[in-house]
From Swiss-Prot:
UniProt cross-references to InterPro entries, sorted A to Z: UreE (IPR012406), UreE_N (IPR004029), UreE_N_sf (IPR036118)
GO terms classed as biological process: protein folding
Protein name per UniProt: Urease accessory protein UreE
GO molecular function: nickel cation binding; unfolded protein binding
SMART domains per record: UreE_N
One CC-aspect GO term: cytoplasm
Encoding gene per record: ureE
Record keywords, A-Z: Chaperone, Cytoplasm, Nickel, Nickel insertion
Ranges of Basic and acidic residues composition bias in the record: 189-202, 212-225
Amino acid sequence: MIVISHVLGNVKTDPVWAEKLKAYELDYLTLEHGDMYKNSCRKMTEQGKDLGISLERNSLLADGDVLLCDDKHAYAIIVKLILRDVMIIDLTDLLNFSHEMMLKISFELGHALGNQHWKSIIHESQVFVPLSVSHKVMESVIQTHRFTGIHYRFEKGDSILSCLTPSEARLLFGGAEDLGAHVHVDHSHSHDFMGHSHEHEGHRHVHNHAGNSHDNEHDEHHSRR
């Protein structure tokens, strides 16, 4: 096992490293959003090198980080970060509204996001919400509320990483496998837990347990209290 205790540099942000490693054989350590905040972990590179990551507390690995550089053999190990997409909700137009309207819309937006149990952070005049369900479902939730003066778009997670503090990045991406993603829109909701999903509006259930699935149609109606 090769122990990695610090980052040497970054090929994405440092042109010196980018130029140096052009002629090197590059091996990649692929990390997903749940791994990037871990100070200590054991991972295999794409070429099968066994790495023991042991970084200082609050260190955060970034896409393009150089973990190992062997000049003798012209070989280097680079971090390849795969982050979930992020919905960016732009609140800039609210600054032109009255204080009362600004507070009202902000409160309603916070309630809508909280009702979905979606994590979010506010950065300047934007709210960042990591993708926990499909783009279509997240769009549906925002569109259902018909917020005035609010615009949204989706961006790749790594495109906003540089403007986040380590604690903010950890909140949005770290260890956040949303095993129980709830979506509540009007009188329908869906759950996705370990392959178990429900849809209520009609009324249909689809279950998938350990490779076994069954589809049940229900005629009965549910009332919500």
